[in-house]
Amino acid sequence: MSYLMLDLLSLDVSEAEAEMLRHPQVGGLILFSRNFSSREQLIALVQQIRQIRPEILIAVDHEGGRVQRFREGFTLIPAMGDILPAAKGDMVLAKRWACELGFLMAIELLACDIDLSFAPVLDLNGISQVIGKRSFSAKPDEVIALAQSFIEGMAEAGMGAVGKHFPGHGSVAADSHIAQPIDEREAEAIFNQDILPFKELIAKGKLSGIMPAHVIYPKVDPNPAGFSSYWLKQILRKELGFNGVIFSDDLGMKGAAFAGDYLGRAQAALDAGCDMILVCNDNPGVMSLLNGFVWPAAAPQHPASLLKPNAAQTAIALENASRWENAKQLAEQIQLAQQAKV
Protein backbone atom coordinates (compact mmCIF):
# COMPACT_ATOMS: atom_id res chain seq x y z
CA MET A 1 0.00 0.00 0.00
CA SER A 2 1.34 3.43 0.98
CA TYR A 3 1.18 5.46 -2.22
CA LEU A 4 0.94 8.95 -0.67
CA MET A 5 3.49 11.41 0.72
CA LEU A 6 2.05 14.43 2.57
CA ASP A 7 3.29 17.29 4.74
CA LEU A 8 2.65 19.05 8.07
CA LEU A 9 1.43 22.54 8.83
CA SER A 10 3.71 23.51 11.71
CA LEU A 11 6.45 22.61 14.19
CA ASP A 12 4.72 19.57 15.65
CA VAL A 13 2.09 17.01 14.69
CA SER A 14 -1.53 17.92 15.38
CA GLU A 15 -4.02 15.21 16.32
CA ALA A 16 -5.70 15.55 12.92
CA GLU A 17 -2.32 15.12 11.22
CA ALA A 18 -1.54 12.13 13.43
CA GLU A 19 -4.73 10.49 12.15
CA MET A 20 -3.65 11.13 8.57
CA LEU A 21 -0.21 9.67 9.25
CA ARG A 22 -1.86 6.48 10.53
CA HIS A 23 -3.75 6.00 7.26
CA PRO A 24 -2.44 2.87 5.48
CA GLN A 25 -2.05 4.72 2.17
CA VAL A 26 0.35 7.25 3.72
CA GLY A 27 3.91 6.05 3.33
CA GLY A 28 5.89 9.28 3.25
CA LEU A 29 6.18 12.71 4.83
CA ILE A 30 8.00 15.72 3.37
CA LEU A 31 9.22 18.50 5.66
CA PHE A 32 9.46 22.21 4.82
CA SER A 33 11.00 25.33 6.39
CA ARG A 34 7.77 25.94 8.31
CA ASN A 35 8.41 22.66 10.17
CA PHE A 36 11.81 23.88 11.40
CA SER A 37 12.88 26.34 14.09
CA SER A 38 16.03 24.66 15.40
CA ARG A 39 17.91 21.39 15.15
CA GLU A 40 16.64 20.36 18.60
CA GLN A 41 13.02 21.07 17.63
CA LEU A 42 13.48 19.12 14.38
CA ILE A 43 14.80 16.07 16.22
CA ALA A 44 11.82 16.22 18.61
CA LEU A 45 9.42 16.50 15.65
CA VAL A 46 10.96 13.49 13.93
CA GLN A 47 10.71 11.50 17.17
CA GLN A 48 7.02 12.45 17.40
CA ILE A 49 6.46 11.31 13.81
CA ARG A 50 8.29 8.03 14.44
CA GLN A 51 6.12 7.31 17.49
CA ILE A 52 3.06 7.55 15.24
CA ARG A 53 4.50 5.73 12.18
CA PRO A 54 7.97 4.27 12.88
CA GLU A 55 8.52 3.06 9.31
CA ILE A 56 7.36 6.17 7.42
CA LEU A 57 9.80 7.65 4.89
CA ILE A 58 10.74 11.18 6.02
CA ALA A 59 12.05 13.41 3.23
CA VAL A 60 13.01 17.02 2.56
CA ASP A 61 14.22 19.20 -0.31
CA HIS A 62 17.74 19.93 0.91
CA GLU A 63 19.77 20.33 -2.28
CA GLY A 64 21.94 23.25 -1.21
CA GLY A 65 21.94 26.84 -2.41
CA ARG A 66 18.50 28.43 -2.33
CA VAL A 67 16.75 25.07 -1.86
CA GLN A 68 17.75 24.13 1.67
CA ARG A 69 14.87 23.91 4.14
CA PHE A 70 16.92 23.68 7.35
CA ARG A 71 19.54 26.35 8.02
CA GLU A 72 20.17 27.27 11.67
CA GLY A 73 22.27 24.45 13.12
CA PHE A 74 22.99 22.99 9.67
CA THR A 75 25.84 23.75 7.30
CA LEU A 76 24.82 25.95 4.39
CA ILE A 77 25.45 23.73 1.37
CA PRO A 78 26.63 25.67 -1.70
CA ALA A 79 24.52 25.70 -4.85
CA MET A 80 25.59 22.81 -7.07
CA GLY A 81 26.31 25.24 -9.89
CA ASP A 82 28.98 26.95 -7.78
CA ILE A 83 31.16 23.86 -7.31
CA LEU A 84 32.97 23.75 -10.66
CA PRO A 85 33.55 27.55 -10.86
CA ALA A 86 34.92 27.52 -7.29
CA ALA A 87 37.31 24.77 -8.38
CA LYS A 88 38.35 27.05 -11.27
CA GLY A 89 37.25 24.45 -13.79
CA ASP A 90 39.40 21.67 -12.30
CA MET A 91 37.05 18.69 -12.73
CA VAL A 92 39.13 16.33 -10.58
CA LEU A 93 38.97 18.80 -7.68
CA ALA A 94 35.30 19.62 -8.31
CA LYS A 95 34.36 15.93 -8.24
CA ARG A 96 36.15 15.48 -4.93
CA TRP A 97 34.34 18.50 -3.53
CA ALA A 98 30.97 17.28 -4.86
CA CYS A 99 31.50 13.95 -3.12
CA GLU A 100 32.25 15.64 0.21
CA LEU A 101 29.24 17.96 -0.12
CA GLY A 102 26.98 14.99 -0.88
CA PHE A 103 28.29 13.27 2.23
CA LEU A 104 27.81 16.43 4.32
CA MET A 105 24.27 17.10 3.12
CA ALA A 106 23.25 13.50 3.79
CA ILE A 107 24.93 12.94 7.15
CA GLU A 108 23.50 16.13 8.68
CA LEU A 109 19.99 14.95 7.79
CA LEU A 110 20.57 11.33 8.79
CA ALA A 111 21.88 12.51 12.17
CA CYS A 112 18.36 13.88 12.74
CA ASP A 113 16.76 10.59 11.58
CA ILE A 114 15.60 12.09 8.27
CA ASP A 115 15.77 9.43 5.58
CA LEU A 116 16.01 11.29 2.32
CA SER A 117 16.76 14.51 0.49
CA PHE A 118 15.17 14.81 -2.93
CA ALA A 119 18.53 15.34 -4.61
CA PRO A 120 20.42 15.82 -6.80
CA VAL A 121 19.02 18.00 -9.57
CA LEU A 122 20.07 16.43 -12.89
CA ASP A 123 18.58 19.16 -15.09
CA LEU A 124 20.90 21.12 -17.35
CA ASN A 125 21.36 24.80 -16.54
CA GLY A 126 19.54 26.39 -19.47
CA ILE A 127 16.90 29.12 -19.61
CA SER A 128 14.92 27.96 -16.57
CA GLN A 129 15.26 30.40 -13.68
CA VAL A 130 13.60 27.94 -11.30
CA ILE A 131 16.50 25.56 -12.00
CA GLY A 132 19.50 27.88 -12.57
CA LYS A 133 22.36 27.11 -10.20
CA ARG A 134 20.45 24.21 -8.68
CA SER A 135 21.98 22.46 -11.71
CA PHE A 136 25.62 21.38 -11.68
CA SER A 137 26.25 22.69 -15.21
CA ALA A 138 24.84 23.45 -18.65
CA LYS A 139 26.87 20.55 -20.08
CA PRO A 140 25.59 16.96 -19.78
CA ASP A 141 29.05 15.44 -19.24
CA GLU A 142 29.78 17.83 -16.38
CA VAL A 143 26.39 17.18 -14.77
CA ILE A 144 27.01 13.43 -15.02
CA ALA A 145 30.50 13.61 -13.50
CA LEU A 146 29.63 15.96 -10.64
CA ALA A 147 26.26 14.37 -9.86
CA GLN A 148 27.83 10.92 -9.73
CA SER A 149 30.39 12.14 -7.21
CA PHE A 150 27.70 13.89 -5.15
CA ILE A 151 25.59 10.71 -5.14
CA GLU A 152 28.59 8.62 -4.10
CA GLY A 153 29.10 10.97 -1.16
CA MET A 154 25.45 10.56 -0.20
CA ALA A 155 25.83 6.78 -0.39
CA GLU A 156 28.91 6.90 1.85
CA ALA A 157 26.63 8.48 4.46
CA GLY A 158 23.99 5.80 3.86
CA MET A 159 21.46 7.84 1.84
CA GLY A 160 19.94 6.97 -1.52
CA ALA A 161 19.64 9.50 -4.35
CA VAL A 162 16.57 10.79 -6.18
CA GLY A 163 17.37 12.41 -9.53
CA LYS A 164 15.10 15.17 -10.76
CA HIS A 165 13.34 16.43 -12.91
CA PHE A 166 13.13 13.70 -15.57
CA PRO A 167 13.64 14.06 -18.53
CA GLY A 168 14.90 17.63 -17.92
CA HIS A 169 13.43 20.96 -16.78
CA GLY A 170 16.29 23.24 -17.77
CA SER A 171 15.09 24.33 -21.22
CA VAL A 172 11.71 25.83 -20.30
CA ALA A 173 11.32 29.32 -18.86
CA ALA A 174 8.01 28.72 -17.06
CA ASP A 175 8.03 27.61 -13.41
CA SER A 176 5.84 24.52 -12.94
CA HIS A 177 4.97 25.65 -9.40
CA ILE A 178 2.86 28.46 -10.91
CA ALA A 179 2.40 27.62 -14.61
CA GLN A 180 2.34 24.76 -17.12
CA PRO A 181 5.77 24.66 -18.80
CA ILE A 182 5.89 23.46 -22.40
CA ASP A 183 9.19 22.44 -23.98
CA GLU A 184 8.71 22.85 -27.73
CA ARG A 185 12.03 21.35 -28.77
CA GLU A 186 12.34 18.37 -31.05
CA ALA A 187 12.69 14.95 -29.43
CA GLU A 188 16.25 14.69 -30.72
CA ALA A 189 17.40 17.65 -28.63
CA ILE A 190 15.91 16.20 -25.44
CA PHE A 191 17.32 12.72 -26.01
CA ASN A 192 20.76 13.99 -27.08
CA GLN A 193 21.11 16.47 -24.21
CA ASP A 194 18.73 16.67 -21.24
CA ILE A 195 18.08 12.99 -20.71
CA LEU A 196 21.76 11.99 -20.72
CA PRO A 197 22.45 12.51 -16.98
CA PHE A 198 19.46 10.31 -16.12
CA LYS A 199 20.45 7.69 -18.69
CA GLU A 200 24.08 7.48 -17.58
CA LEU A 201 23.41 7.47 -13.84
CA ILE A 202 20.70 4.83 -14.21
CA ALA A 203 23.12 2.68 -16.22
CA LYS A 204 25.69 3.05 -13.43
CA GLY A 205 23.14 2.05 -10.78
CA LYS A 206 23.42 5.38 -8.95
CA LEU A 207 19.74 6.38 -8.69
CA SER A 208 17.35 4.86 -6.14
CA GLY A 209 14.55 7.22 -7.11
CA ILE A 210 13.50 9.64 -9.84
CA MET A 211 11.09 12.56 -9.84
CA PRO A 212 9.61 13.50 -13.23
CA ALA A 213 8.98 17.06 -14.36
CA HIS A 214 5.55 18.69 -14.61
CA VAL A 215 6.61 19.71 -18.13
CA ILE A 216 4.93 18.91 -21.46
CA TYR A 217 7.21 17.90 -24.33
CA PRO A 218 4.64 17.98 -27.18
CA LYS A 219 7.06 16.74 -29.85
CA VAL A 220 7.36 13.53 -27.78
CA ASP A 221 4.06 13.08 -25.89
CA PRO A 222 1.04 15.32 -25.18
CA ASN A 223 1.05 14.68 -21.42
CA PRO A 224 3.36 16.21 -18.80
CA ALA A 225 6.15 13.75 -18.04
CA GLY A 226 4.80 12.97 -14.57
CA PHE A 227 1.46 11.95 -16.10
CA SER A 228 2.88 10.21 -19.16
CA SER A 229 3.08 6.43 -19.39
CA TYR A 230 5.25 6.93 -22.47
CA TRP A 231 7.88 8.84 -20.51
CA LEU A 232 7.68 6.74 -17.34
CA LYS A 233 6.93 3.22 -18.58
CA GLN A 234 8.32 3.18 -22.11
CA ILE A 235 11.36 5.45 -21.77
CA LEU A 236 12.29 5.40 -18.08
CA ARG A 237 11.42 1.81 -17.18
CA LYS A 238 11.79 -0.08 -20.47
CA GLU A 239 14.43 1.77 -22.49
CA LEU A 240 16.57 3.15 -19.66
CA GLY A 241 16.03 0.15 -17.39
CA PHE A 242 15.25 2.13 -14.24
CA ASN A 243 14.07 -0.14 -11.41
CA GLY A 244 13.88 2.33 -8.52
CA VAL A 245 11.06 4.43 -7.10
CA ILE A 246 9.25 7.04 -9.22
CA PHE A 247 7.95 9.93 -7.11
CA SER A 248 5.49 12.38 -8.59
CA ASP A 249 6.38 16.02 -8.11
CA ASP A 250 3.90 17.90 -5.92
CA LEU A 251 0.39 17.36 -7.31
CA GLY A 252 -0.58 20.77 -5.92
CA MET A 253 1.65 22.59 -8.40
CA LYS A 254 0.09 24.44 -11.32
CA GLY A 255 1.93 22.16 -13.70
CA ALA A 256 -0.22 19.29 -12.38
CA ALA A 257 -3.56 21.02 -13.04
CA PHE A 258 -3.49 19.43 -16.49
CA ALA A 259 -5.01 16.30 -14.92
CA GLY A 260 -7.97 17.97 -13.17
CA ASP A 261 -8.76 17.80 -9.45
CA TYR A 262 -6.72 15.81 -6.94
CA LEU A 263 -8.60 12.61 -7.65
CA GLY A 264 -7.83 13.01 -11.36
CA ARG A 265 -4.23 13.99 -10.72
CA ALA A 266 -3.59 11.02 -8.44
CA GLN A 267 -5.18 8.59 -10.89
CA ALA A 268 -3.23 10.02 -13.82
CA ALA A 269 0.09 9.89 -11.93
CA LEU A 270 -0.41 6.31 -10.75
CA ASP A 271 -1.65 5.16 -14.17
CA ALA A 272 1.41 6.73 -15.78
CA GLY A 273 3.72 4.76 -13.53
CA CYS A 274 4.42 6.78 -10.37
CA ASP A 275 5.00 4.68 -7.24
CA MET A 276 4.42 7.47 -4.72
CA ILE A 277 2.51 10.72 -5.18
CA LEU A 278 3.25 13.95 -3.31
CA VAL A 279 0.57 16.38 -2.16
CA CYS A 280 2.00 19.44 -0.40
CA ASN A 281 0.58 22.62 1.12
CA ASP A 282 -3.03 21.47 0.76
CA ASN A 283 -4.61 19.60 3.68
CA PRO A 284 -8.07 19.55 2.06
CA GLY A 285 -6.47 18.02 -1.03
CA VAL A 286 -4.90 15.29 1.09
CA MET A 287 -8.21 14.61 2.82
CA SER A 288 -10.03 14.39 -0.51
CA LEU A 289 -7.63 11.63 -1.53
CA LEU A 290 -7.70 9.75 1.76
CA ASN A 291 -11.49 9.84 1.89
CA GLY A 292 -12.51 9.68 -1.76
CA PHE A 293 -9.82 8.08 -3.91
CA VAL A 294 -9.97 4.44 -4.96
CA TRP A 295 -6.41 3.34 -4.26
CA PRO A 296 -4.81 0.40 -6.08
CA ALA A 297 -5.44 -2.93 -4.37
CA ALA A 298 -1.84 -4.05 -4.81
CA ALA A 299 1.18 -2.50 -3.13
CA PRO A 300 3.50 -0.33 -5.26
CA GLN A 301 5.77 -2.42 -7.43
CA HIS A 302 8.68 -0.23 -6.31
CA PRO A 303 7.83 0.78 -2.71
CA ALA A 304 9.27 3.99 -1.30
CA SER A 305 10.74 1.93 1.55
CA LEU A 306 13.52 1.11 -0.94
CA LEU A 307 14.81 4.62 -0.13
CA LYS A 308 15.28 3.91 3.59
CA PRO A 309 18.89 4.58 4.61
CA ASN A 310 21.62 1.98 4.88
CA ALA A 311 21.70 1.95 8.69
CA ALA A 312 25.06 0.20 8.97
CA GLN A 313 26.70 2.67 6.59
CA THR A 314 25.14 5.62 8.42
CA ALA A 315 26.41 4.33 11.77
CA ILE A 316 29.95 4.20 10.37
CA ALA A 317 29.62 7.68 8.81
CA LEU A 318 28.33 9.22 12.04
CA GLU A 319 31.57 8.14 13.73
CA ASN A 320 33.67 9.97 11.13
CA ALA A 321 33.69 13.37 12.83
CA SER A 322 36.81 14.57 11.02
CA ARG A 323 35.28 14.04 7.58
CA TRP A 324 32.14 15.87 8.67
CA GLU A 325 34.16 18.80 10.01
CA ASN A 326 36.39 19.00 6.93
CA ALA A 327 33.32 18.97 4.67
CA LYS A 328 31.82 21.86 6.66
CA GLN A 329 34.98 23.88 6.09
CA LEU A 330 34.87 23.05 2.38
CA ALA A 331 31.26 24.25 2.13
CA GLU A 332 32.22 27.53 3.78
CA GLN A 333 35.22 27.89 1.47
CA ILE A 334 33.05 27.51 -1.64
CA GLN A 335 30.47 29.95 -0.27
CA LEU A 336 33.20 32.54 0.36
CA ALA A 337 34.65 32.04 -3.11
CA GLN A 338 31.23 32.69 -4.63
CA GLN A 339 30.62 35.78 -2.46
CA ALA A 340 33.99 37.19 -3.52
CA LYS A 341 32.88 37.03 -7.17
CA VAL A 342 29.65 38.94 -6.56
Curated annotation (Swiss-Prot):
Cellular component, GO annotation: cytoplasm
Keyword Nucleus: no
Keyword Transmembrane appears in the UniProt entry: no
Entry-linked InterPro entries: Beta_hexosaminidase_bac, Glyco_hydro_3_AS, Glyco_hydro_3_N, Glyco_hydro_3_N_sf, Glycoside_hydrolase_SF, NagZ_Beta-hexosaminidase
The organism's place on the tree of life at top rank: Bacteria
Location within or outside the cell: Cytoplasm
Predominant place of localization: cytoplasm
Keywords of the record: Cell cycle, Cell division, Cell shape, Cell wall biogenesis/degradation, Cytoplasm, Glycosidase, Hydrolase, Peptidoglycan synthesis
Binding site for substrate: D61, R69, R134, K164, H165
UniProt record similarity statement: Belongs to the glycosyl hydrolase 3 family. NagZ subfamily.
Protein's name according to its UniProt entry: Beta-hexosaminidase
Classification lineage: Bacteria, Pseudomonadati, Pseudomonadota, Gammaproteobacteria, Alteromonadales
Gene: nagZ
